[in-house]
Every structure is written in C-alpha cells, then in structure tokens.
Amino acid sequence: MLPQKRGRIPSRIAMSCYWKVLAIFSLSLPSALSFQPAQPRVLLVSFDGFRWDYIYKVSTPNFHDAMENGVHVKQVTNVFVTKTYPNHYTMVTGLYAESHGIVANEMHDPILNETFSLNKMDVYNSKFWEEASPIWVTNQREGHKTGAAMWPGTDVKIHGVFPTYFMPYNESVSFEDRVARLIHWFTSEEPINFGLLYWEQPDEMGHILGPENPLMGPIISDIDKKLGYLMSELKKAKLWDVINVIITSDHGMSQSSSERLIELDQYLNRELYKVIDHSPAVAILPKEGKLDEVYEALANAHPNMTVYKKEQIPDRLHYKHNSRIQPILAVADKGWEIVYNRSDSFQFGNHGYDNILPEMHPIFLAVGPAFRKNVTKEVMNATDLYPLLCHLLGINPLPNNGSFNAVKDILAEEFPVALGGDTYATVIGVFLGSFLVMVFTAVFLKHFVLTHANTMQMQHTEAAQPLLQD
C-alpha cells in the first residue's frame, strides 16, 4: 500500500464530476434560454378620420376598455396638411410632410414632371415615396418580418422593398378578412413582428354626413364593434397578452356648410392657374409668369381664406421645403370650403385644415405589455409615434422629426431604445446563466482546495508514522 497516492482518487473523481456537470449545464443553458418570450410584437391600427372626441359621442365600450387597460393620449397634433396620405406616411417615418415628400393626396412634382393622385394608378409610382424610408423597410433589413393589411403605401415597392406580406389595396375587402390575415401572419411558422391595419371608416361617412350629424352615432358604434372584434380575435389566437396594440388615426373631421363657401371664380380667371390639391388647403399652380397676379387677386379676397406664397407659409406648419409644395397655398378657416363656384360637389364634413385645430386631431390609444395601464397623457405629436414604434420593435430609427423622450412616459418600464434582435429575456437569461456558472465554479474550487488540503495532511501523517514506530 502506497500512502502518498491516497488523495489522488478523490480529486480525480471530483474533477471528473465537475466537467460532467459543467458539460450538462452548458448544454442545457441554451435550451433554458430558448424558453424566453418571442420577439416583441406590435400591431398599428388606423381608423381613417376617427376624431379624438368620437369616443364620447356615443357608447364605445371597447375603446374605453382599451383606455382602462392602456394609455390614452387626449390630443395628438398631426402634420399639415391634415389629410390621409401625408399623415399615414408620417406615422411610419416620423417625418413632416415636407421631409417625407407625400405632401398631399394630390401632387405634382415639377422635377419629375409627374402627378400623384388617389384616383389614378399614380400612387404606385415609387418615385413619390422614396424621399423617406418607412418603418417596414428598416424592420425587414434588420431581419424581421412585416405584414400589412391595406395601410397606405404598403402595396408600393419602396427602395426595392415590399412588406414581407401585404394585401394590395381593395376597399371591398372586409375588416374581418383583414384581421384574419394579420392573425395568420402573427401566428405562422415564420411570424411577423410588426403588423399594420387600415380601415376606411369613419372617414367616408364623416365626409358624407358631417361629424356633428346624429347619424354618425351608428357609424362610430360600428367602429367600436370592429375594435371589439379585433380584440376578441387576438385573444382567441393567444396574442392579446403579448402584443402591443396602438389604435390611432390620420386626422379628425370638421363640419362644413353650404353657407360657408369661398368661390374662386369670383376673384380669378381659371385660365391663370391650376388647382393641384383641393379644399380646404388648396395647392395652386399659377400659369408661367402669372404668380404675382394670381397671388394679388387672392391674397385679400375673403376674410375666411388665408393665402400664402410658398416662402410665406408659417414655419410651424413645416410645409414649404419641398418642390411638390405648390407656389401658392390657400387655406380656409375651420368649417369653410374653397371651391370654384357653388356648382362644385360639396361635402358636409372635411379635413385638411390647420393642424392646430382640435377638430383635426385623431384618436390615440395604446394597450399591451409595454404600456402603462389606465393612464392619460395630455399631448403628443404624430411624429413621435415612429421612434416609439422603433423602440417597441427593438430596431434602430432613421433620422426623424419625432422624439422618443416625449412619449417614453407612457411605457410600463424603461427599456433600451434599440436592443436589436435580443429581447430583455435574452439579456436576463444570459446574465443568470453566467452567474450560476460562476457560483458553481467557486463552490467546486472551494471543495477541491479543501479536499486537496486534507489529502496532503493525510500524506504527511502517514509518511511520518515509520519514524514514530522506530
């Protein structure tokens, strides 16, 4: 028997056990971390023309349920002009209209010598959209997937990119079918992390009836039911508790009257100019050499119409630094309409007025795990939505006119602005895993040192015994 070898067996066994346990732990750690929640998911919903105060005009239980379980912003200052295409593009770029280039629903680009019109196929001309890059382009370039159900611009190839999945615009497609498609995209084997949903109402009926018409009540109630349907379908798909939903609009609506018409024919010969975009913010292109003549004829023509040369447009409107903004802009006061004459078609509701007017402001609700509950915020700018969306998605925002700091107070807790592909669960999981490895290593080393020390003591004792026996 060799006493000096007695301590080696325990140390070898301990070392063998250590490496086995460490190997098992290392193999199991990725599996444990894989149970983290899925990537952040966001659904952006726009009910076109849903004015901020519609929720108080009739019973809207589903809107109020979202308010109680999320965030409600009372006044959202959208961008001028307060029309559909400029504001929908602002929401997904964070830019003023003069910066993103979609300056109106109807446009003429003097550099391209081309027009853009909602009533023609011109809206699919990529050149009009590429002064900015919408959020779905960034989202996909950072490795994620986007799904869009009729959102303006999502069926246009912008910078060579379509959304991963999209529905070509077709007004006849029902709200329910749009929701079903989005649910499918969110729950597929390769799911989207960002969805966009657009619905044409209550804008269409708001134009026909006017926002103050009692007949708008059933229209608003129907929108509330559609929101309830969306919430129900998200719950059925087990998405409601994990998805962040933002419910908003592009603009509000103002009541018009046939008694409040400004007739251009009373002041100016039509041969001198062309109207590019229509009431209540009228973009006027004078014939060559007629700029001053047209301006002077209109400048003081009517007390309820303000006329600007392009360079005179107030800075607060952020609406003069783009070639698609016409040389003259005529803006009607709230409730007034600018027409050629009384034979023109007339609508009882309209938008496009100064964005300082509360009647032009849209609804804004946000509900989901990222948001505080039952919180009311007084004001925000529509441009702030884009950096908020980028934050929620964990992607890096492009330069924009918004401010994340202006809206971060609606979030449930602070997160880094851009986490890339990593979620907080990943960060926490890696930290805890590393910590456990360190603790395990420390405990083992302590055990190993103590065992080794005991072995040395045993060796020393047995080596000394023959001398004692002598």
Give short role names for the model-derived ranges.
Residues 17-33:
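Cleavable N-terminal signal peptides of Sec/SRP-targeted secreted and luminal proteins
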Residues 17-18, 82, 94-211, 303, ...:
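His/Asp/Glu-rich, glycine-adjacent segments
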Residues 30-72, 468:
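Active-site-proximal N-terminal segment of extracellular/periplasmic enzymes that hydrolyze or transfer
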Residues 37, 172-187, 193-195, 202-243, ...:
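A long, amphipathic alpha-helix that forms part
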Residues 44, 62, 222-263, 330:
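Metal-dependent active-site segment of extracytoplasmic phospho-/sulfohydrolases and closely related
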Residues 52-100:
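Short, structured active-site-proximal loop/turn typified by the sulfatase FGly-forming signature C/S-X-P-X-R
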Residues 242, 249-289, 421-423:
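Acidic/histidine-rich catalytic neighborhood
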Residues 273-376, 380-388, 452-464, 468-470:
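Active-site neighborhoods of enzymes that stabilize oxyanions during catalysis
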